[in-house]
A protein has these predicted regions:
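Short, flexible loop/turn elements at secondary-structure junctions
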Residues: 1-4, 15, 29, 64, ...
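P-loop NTPase motor domains
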Residues: 41-56, 60-276, 289-291, 324, ...
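Basic- and hydrophobic-enriched, low-structure N-terminal and domain-boundary segments
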Residues: 1-28, 36, 40-43, 47-50, ...
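P-loop NTPase motor core of the ASCE superfamily
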Residues: 12-14, 23, 288-367
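Conserved lysine of the Walker
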Residues: 33
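A structural signal for short, well-ordered beta-strand segments and their strand-loop junctions
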Residues: 36, 58-61, 304
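H-loop/switch region of ABC-family ATPase nucleotide-binding domains
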Residues: 282
Length: 367
C-alpha cells in the first residue's frame, strides 16, 4: 500500500535485523482485513515464486471466502489453483497429524502422550477429570505400542481409551470428543503431501468456528508443522536477509487463542529459526492479550485496522505511549476507514526526534 504522503509502504519480513517475522492483524468486520491478507500473500508469493526460495503458505479459511468457487479468480494472485484447496468434509486432510516414533525411546512417547492428552482436553469446553486425562495419556502410549511407534489414529486412540473405561458403553467427555474426531475422519493415516513445500487453503466454514472439530483441525495441523520443523534444515542466510520458507495464516484466530495452544506458541517462538512464520488475524485487538501467551510481545508487526472498540491498555502496550501521544493514536484508530491501518514506527525516536511513533497505511485494493 501507501503511506499518507504517497510513499510506497513496505514491511521488512526477512531482513537480518528483524527479530521475528510474525504478523498480527486486528480489524472488525468491514475493515478490509480479508483484502489485507490477500495483499500480503500476493506480495510474498510474487516476489519469491521465480527464485530458488519460494515462500509457501497454509491458510485456514474460516469464512470460506478464499475457497469459494465464486472467488476462484483470487487464486491466480497467489500463483495457485483450486487443487490447493483442502476440504475436510469431502476428503480427509492428506497427512497424518501424529508423530512417527519408530525406533525412538518409550520416554519420548510418554511425553508426547501427555501433550496430546492436554490438547484434547483443551479443545473441548467440557469438564475433564485428572483421571480421564491420565487414562487418555495411557491410551495414547498403548496405541503407539500396538503400531510399534508408527503414527496412530484417533480410532486407535479411542479403542485404547474405551478399554480402560469402567463402563465403555457410557461416554465421558474424552470418548465423546474422540468419537467426533473419528466420525468426521479428518486426517489420512499417512503423509501424501508436504505441508511446507506446497501451498494449501483449508476450507473451514462447514464447521462451527468455536466447535471441537474446527479447533482440532487447526491444533493438529499446527502440531504437524511443529513435527516438520524438527526435521528441517536451518534456512539459507546471507549478509542482508534470511530465507522465509512458509507462512501459516489463521483468519478468525481468536477461536484458537482462548486456550493453551502449545503448538502455536512453539511455532511462534522458534519457527523463525527455520523460516516458518505465522500471520494471525482477528476482529478485536483484545484477542491477542491471551492469559496463556502474549502475542503482541512476539509479533514484529501488529497491524491495527478499524475497531469495534478500542482497548486502552493494548494501545499503550503496543505503541508505548501515554498522555497526548496516546490520545492521538486512539483518535487515529477511531477514524480509520475500510482498507486503512496503522503500524508502529520507531524512526523518529531512533533519530532522537520528536514526532509520531506510528504511520497510517492505505492498503492496496486487490480483491
Amino acid at each position: 500500500g501507501e503511506y499518507g504522503d504517497g510513499i510506497e509502504a513496505k514491511l521488512n519480513i526477512n531482513g537480518r535485523s528483524v527479530s521475528n517475522s510474525q504478523v498480527i492483524i486486528a480489524g472488525t468486520t468491514g475493515s478490509g482485513k480479508t483484502n489485507l491478507l490477500a495483499v500480503i500473500i500476493e506480495q510474498f508469493r510474487s516476489l519469491s515464486i521465480e527464485t530458488p526460495y519460494p515462500v509457501n503458505f497454509l491458510l485456514f479459511d474460516y469464512k470460506g471466502e478464499f475457497s469459494d468457487p465464486a472467488n476462484s479468480h483470487w487464486l491466480q494472485h497467489f500463483e495457485v489453483d483450486r487443487s490447493s484447496i483442502l476440504d475436510p468434509v469431502k476428503a480427509p486432510l492428506p497427512f497424518t497429524p501424529f508423530k512417527d516414533f519408530s525406533g525412538r525411546p518409550i520416554n519420548e512417547i510418554n511425553l508426547y502422550s501427555t501433550e496430546m492428552a492436554n490438547a484434547l482436553c483443551a479443545i473441548d469446553k467440557a469438564s475433564i477429570s485428572a483421571n480421564m486425562s491420565n487414562r487418555l495419556s495411557e491410551a495414547i502410549v498403548d496405541a503407539y505400542k500396538k503400531t510399534n511407534g508408527r503414527p496412530i489414529t484417533f480410532n486407535e486412540m479411542l479403542n485404547q481409551y474405551r478399554s480402560k473405561m469402567v463402563n465403555a458403553d457410557k461416554d465421558d467427555s474424552i470418548s465423546s470428543v474422540l468419537k467426533q474426531l473419528v466420525r468426521n475422519n479428518l486426517f489420512e493415516t499417512e503423509d501424501k503431501i508436504d505441508l511446507v513445500n506446497g501451498c494449501y487453503i483449508v476450507k473451514m466454514d462447514s464447521f462451527p468456528k468455536d466447535g471441537v472439530i474446527a479447533k482440532a483441525i487447526v491444533y493438529f495441523v499446527i502440531s504437524k508443522l511443529n513435527n516438520i520443523y524438527e526435521k528441517l534444515e536451518k534456512q539459507a542466510v546471507n549478509d542482508e536477509c534470511v530465507q522465509i520458507r512458509h507462512f501459516t495464516i489463521i483468519d478468525e484466530a481468536h477461536y484458537m487463542l482462548d486456550f493453551d495452544n502449545q503448538p502455536l506458541r512453539n511455532l511462534i517462538a522458534v519457527g523463525r529459526n527455520k523460516g516458518l512464520s505465522i500471520i494471525l488475524a482477528t476482529q478485536n485487538m483484545d484477542s491477542f492479550k491471551s492469559k496463556h501467551f502474549d502475542f503482541y510481545a512476539n509479533a514484529q508487526y501488529p497491524l491495527i485496522m478499524k475497531q469495534q472498540s478500542i482497548n486502552d491498555s493494548v494501545i499503550k502496550d503496543i505503541f508505548g505511549v501515554t498522555g497526548k501521544d496516546f490520545n492521538d493514536i486512539k483518535a487515529e484508530i477511531a477514524s480509520l476507514q475500510k482498507g486503512e491501518l496503522i503500524i508502529k514506527d520507531d524512526t523518529m525516536s531512533l533519530l532522537g526526534i520528536s514526532g509520531k511513533n506510528y504511520k497510517k497505511i492505505k492498503v492496496t485494493h486487490l480483491i
